Amino acid sequence: MKATKTTYKKDPMGLTPSQIVNELNRFIVGQEKAKKAVAIALRNRCRRKRVEGNLRNEIVPKNILMIGSTGVGKTEIARRLATLTNSPFYKIEATKFTEVGYVGRDVESIIRDLVEIAVNTEKTLAKTKVDIHAREKAIERILDSLVGKTSSSETREKFKEKILNGELDDTEIEISVADTTPVGGGSFEIPGMPGASMGVLNLGDMIGRALGSSKTKTKKMLVKDAMAIIIPEESEKLIDQEKIIQQAINLAENDGIVFIDEIDKIASTGSSRAKNAEISREGVQRDLLPLIEGTTVNTKYGPVKTDHILFIASGAFHIAKPSDLLPELQGRLPIRVELNSLTKDDMIKILLEPETSLIKQYSALIGTEDVRLEFAASAIEKIADYAITVNLEVEDIGARRLHTILENLLEDISFEASEMKGKKITIDDKFVENQLSKIITNLDLAKFVL
């Protein structure tokens, strides 16, 4: 049954678990156990906020371990969950980290990045609230450049009307704008640690705040370009930066979701212990322990507590087993959910049912060329058949196999669509077979092409 958008009765605690599952069903096929687990975890957060007194601080989120092969929906479930709740969401692979003391990223950068996302979210929200006022101030600055500060109100009103109507978009003006050239300092990459940066405030920002002003420079530009630069500048002046930072830290601490993928890759199997082939995997696990259990991480915005951040870890566990993780880490991921491998029926549903299904995406893309692309039921079944076959014979990459198959299937149509305006193309099982049968039957070729 096709999942559709539903309007729910207003609940003081937000979406109920069943409503969350219904929303996830709009985008993700199957995996009911995983959806149920994340829905309960999310609802428990809302419940905790309504608990009175000291007991509220004692209630911690029940972190989740998702077990399942690639392409079955682990990441998508967590990502859609964050979108549903407007929560700060950060996804990272466990293999990106090394034990403290070695060259590489340390696990505390997870929280620094999460807070950065929360700050940007709060800042964007605050800017939308002052957008009208910021636009007015931007127009006033442009009018100063166009007609001068001493011009009559009648003249200013006349030119303001022209700006609003877009009549002066291509008029060149000379105007002072903020100088965004880095003064030094700022967040900079640490040598030998790709992706890691020092959590320090921009030196220029600090000097600007101390002096109550910022450096500007005069530039020549078109009115439309000036509007695009000045509106954000004015928005920055109108919003309360300190308040935004406090709200962002609170949002990250109480609503943040961290998704740690490939956690099975840092599990220490017997062979890896004996060979000592990699920098301590156990060390990374031990570094993760306090973060997941609850600690305070210093960021450039201030200290952030991780006690109530929801951690969702996932892994395929083809070689290692969940029991190969440190016992302490296993204890901090109490909810375990096994995601099922995808069947042929699942593949058919993935192609057809989600609101943003692949078939709808490709039809919309080709449709922009005034070409109508349709898929017969027999074609959908054949595509699903081929996806399952290649997953079984080559390597199981789940629903991601559909992307490669459809790209190969529609390659010629995508190339020639611009010369087929007004036509209708129907994809049936014979077309699918003609395009893909040679690749499917030659498994050595399929390994490289599909």
Curated annotation (Swiss-Prot):
Predominant subcellular localization, coarse grouping: cytoplasm
Similarity annotation: Belongs to the ClpX chaperone family. HslU subfamily.
Residues given in the record as ATP binding sites: 29, 71-76, 261, 328, 400
Keywords: ATP-binding, Chaperone, Cytoplasm, Nucleotide-binding
Record GO cellular component, one term: HslUV protease complex
Gene Ontology MF, one: peptidase activity
Record-linked Pfam families: AAA (PF00004), AAA_2 (PF07724)
Record's subunit section: A double ring-shaped homohexamer of HslV is capped on each side by a ring-shaped HslU homohexamer. The assembly of the HslU/HslV complex is dependent on binding of ATP.
Lineage: Bacteria, Pseudomonadati, Pseudomonadota, Alphaproteobacteria, Rickettsiales
HAMAP family assigned: HslU (MF_00249)
Function: ATPase subunit of a proteasome-like degradation complex; this subunit has chaperone activity. The binding of ATP and its subsequent hydrolysis by HslU are essential for unfolding of protein substrates subsequently hydrolyzed by HslV. HslU recognizes the N-terminal part of its protein substrates and unfolds these before they are guided to HslV for hydrolysis.
Protein name: ATP-dependent protease ATPase subunit HslU
Compartments, as annotated in UniProt: Cytoplasm
GO biological process, one term: protein unfolding
Keyword Membrane annotated: no
Organism: Rickettsia rickettsii (strain Sheila Smith)
Highest taxon of source: Bacteria
